[in-house]
UniProtKB/Swiss-Prot annotation:
Species name: Agkistrodon piscivorus leucostoma (Western cottonmouth)
Main enzyme class: hydrolase
One GO CC annotation: secretory granule
PROSITE patterns referenced in this protein's UniProt entry, alphabetically: TRYPSIN_DOM (PS50240), TRYPSIN_SER (PS00135)
Name under which the protein is recorded: Protein C activator
Positions of the propeptide segment: 19-24
Family statement drawn from the similarity comment of this UniProt entry: Belongs to the peptidase S1 family. Snake venom subfamily.
Length: 255
């Protein structure tokens, strides 16, 4: 009952937030309820982000999603019809790389969160493994989130929307954004029409079944031609992530 009341309040805040932001999943369709068991909804001080459960105790999201009063929801699909196995967790520990921001791009935009209590696999909750190889240009990738499905005016879905996009040549994003970090991926549709943006920050980019990216930044308005999304490249951080999880909290980030 408490979780239901919390989610009702979250919906109200979600509506308010969407009126301020046009940068979310555009050009997609409703996700299948069984395709996003790893997807987390991260809520902190009026801001919404996505996240990815990578084992029973850890979630990956974007560094710039870090705000006070963070709550992490798992097992969610329709925000108006609560799944029986939906859970709420809080951060027990947070880990970052040194984060530098210029006027356009976040560098090392990654945050590893240890949950206050582990979760169990269930009908709507299961982790997504870290990648074994980096993606190649042209790879088909899946993105998802609960954000607005129209831009610039907001239209909110009750369920997360998913879209297929592609890994693009790094030069496309270099031309679109100043100061692009080397540990990022460029992904979208070159001619526009499908994309993720700010409101889905921290959500996953899944290419050929592997968790390859964390949404960092995108164009505004979103889904514009030659303005694809920029994603933190998860493969480059796998050693750091695994070291932190194993207890080496002084592990070095990639350069």
């Amino acid at each position: 009952m408490v979780l239901i009341r919390v989610l009702a309040n979250l919906l109200i805040l979600h509506l308010s937030y969407a009126q301020k932001s046009s940068e979310l999943v555009i050009g997609g369709d409703e996700c299948n309820i069984n395709e996003h068991r790893f997807l987390a909804l991260v809520y902190a001080n009026g801001s919404l982000c996505g996240g990815t459960l990578i084992n029973q105790e850890w979630v990956l999201t974007a560094r710039h999603c870090d705000r006070g009063n963070m709550r992490i929801y798992l097992g969610m699909h329709n925000l108006k019809v609560l799944n029986k196995d939906a859970l709420r967790r809080f951060p027990k520990e947070k880990y970052f790389c040194l984060n530098i921001r210029n006027d356009t791009i976040w560098d090392k935009d990654i945050m590893l969160i240890r949950l206050n209590r582990p979760v169990r696999n269930s009908a709507h909750i299961a982790p997504l493994s870290l990648p074994s190889n980096p993606p190649s240009v042209g790879s088909v990738c899946r993105v998802m989130g609960w954000g607005t499905i129209t831009s610039p005016n907001a239209t909110l879905p009750d369920v997360p929307h998913c879209a297929n996009i592609n890994i693009l040549d790094y030069a496309v994003c270099q031309a679109a954004y100043r100061g692009l970090a080397a540990t990022t991926l460029c992904s979208g549709i070159l001619e526009g029409g499908k994309d993720t943006c700010k409101g889905d920050s921290g959500g996953p980019l899944i290419c050929n079944g592997q968790f390859q990216g964390i949404l960092s930044v995108g164009g505004n308005p979103c889904a514009q031609p030659r303005k694809p999304g920029v994603y933190t490249k998860v493969f480059d951080y796998t050693d750091w992530i695994q070291s932190i999880i194993s207890g080496n909290t002084d592990a070095a980030c990639p350069p």
